[in-house]
Structures are given as structure tokens and as C-alpha cells.
């Protein structure tokens, strides 16, 4: 079996929180490392560096146009969210809202991951994220990663201290790339 040509694809990684030094951004580190190891070109959408508008609010849409362009050029998307109060983050939803309707995510293969402080993980937020993304036409692939008790998994250095979780996070790249280039 031939190895897929990972360099032929472009991936967009979406950080679904604007909190500095968040556990969600830490969970993306092994994924970003895996993309780099495999020489996969990628773009990171970091909402802390953007000024996105809430629906119905008039204003400058420069950053919305920027993320629409980035996502429209992607062959696949990796979407992350923390679980806040039993839900995906408002920031993750705001990013989705700024991608338009019909959404530029329609028809895009995606993998999703969530992090939560509780022992139940990010199951609720991932269910909601999957529903919303599917509704707008994204192809959400099986195998989401939910990181429970996230404060015990990632150290202050940002590194994942659980080899099983790190393997699953890195595996999201393979799931996505296998779909894009079977």
C-alpha cells in the first residue's frame, strides 16, 4: 500500500477558544507537531488574534473574510473546542457563524476534539459541535477525541503527559489525511 502524499493537502486548524494558554491550545500542540512531522501545510485560526462580529452586528468584516478564505482553501479541517458549562464554547460558535451560510465548511472533511476539566470529558460539546457542523454541510469524520480531566493531562509546559491521549490526538491527523488521500 502506498503512503499518502500528505504534502498534497492543506489543513486548517481551528482553535475554538480565545483564552490565553488554554488547555485547548495545548491539546492542539501534538496535532500541529504531527502536521509538521509529515510536512503537511496548515493554517491556524486563533480567535484571540481576530476581531469577529456577532451575527446581526454591523462592522468591519475583514477577519471574517480572512477566515472564510483560509477555510475555503483547506482540503480538511481540525476543529477544537473546550467544554464550558456543558456546551461548546461561544468562541467556537462565533467562528462558525463568521464562516457564512451557506458555510465555506460545507463539503469539507473534518475531525473534532474537545477538552474538559471534568471526568466526563467534552462529550456534550463534541455532540453539539458535530451537530452544528453536520447541519452546515461539513463531513465530520468518526473518531473524535475527548480529553477528560484536562488539567491532569497537560503540564504547565504545555506537553501532554498521557501517551495514550497524545497518540489519539496525533491520530486525528491520520484519520483526516486518510480520508483526503486514501
Question: Predicted regions: what is each one?
Answer:
Residues 17-18, 49-52, 112, 117, ...:
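A short, flexible beta-alpha/helix-coil linker loop
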Residues 58-59, 91-94, 118-122, 136-139, ...:
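Short amphipathic alpha-helical patches
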Residues 109-149, 163-164:
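Short, glycine-/small-residue-rich phosphate/pyrophosphate-handling segment
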Residues 8, 106-107:
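A glycine-biased structural micro-motif
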Residues 1-101, 159-182:
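N-terminal beta1-alpha1-beta2 submodule of the flavodoxin-like/Rossmannoid cofactor-binding fold
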Residues 43-54, 101-103, 136-156:
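Mobile beta-alpha loop/short-helix "lid" or hinge segments that flank ligand
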Amino acid at each position: 500500500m502506498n503512503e499518502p502524499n500528505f504534502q498534497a493537502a492543506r489543513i486548517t486548524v481551528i482553535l475554538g477558544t480565545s483564552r490565553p494558554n488554554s488547555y485547548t491550545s495545548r491539546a492542539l500542540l501534538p496535532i500541529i507537531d504531527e502536521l509538521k512531522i509529515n510536512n503537511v501545510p496548515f493554517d491556524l485560526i486563533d480567535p484571540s488574534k481576530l476581531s469577529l462580529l456577532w451575527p446581526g452586528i454591523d462592522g468591519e468584516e475583514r477577519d471574517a473574510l480572512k477566515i472564510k478564505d483560509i477555510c475555503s482553501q483547506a482540503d480538511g479541517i481540525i476543529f477544537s473546542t473546550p467544554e464550558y458549562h456543558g456546551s461548546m464554547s461561544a468562541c467556537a460558535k462565533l467562528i462558525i457563524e463568521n464562516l457564512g451560510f451557506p458555510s465555506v465548511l460545507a463539503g469539507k472533511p473534518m475531525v473534532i476534539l474537545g477538552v474538559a476539566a471534568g471526568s466526563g470529558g467534552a462529550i456534550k460539546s463534541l455532540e453539539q459541535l458535530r451537530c452544528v457542523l453536520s447541519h452546515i454541510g461539513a463531513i465530520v469524520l468518526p473518531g473524535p477525541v475527548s480529553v477528560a480531566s484536562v488539567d491532569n493531562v497537560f503540564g504547565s509546559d504545555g506537553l501532554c503527559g498521557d501517551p495514550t491521549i497524545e497518540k489519539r490526538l496525533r491520530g486525528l491527523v491520520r484519520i483526516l489525511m486518510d480520508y483526503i488521500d486514501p
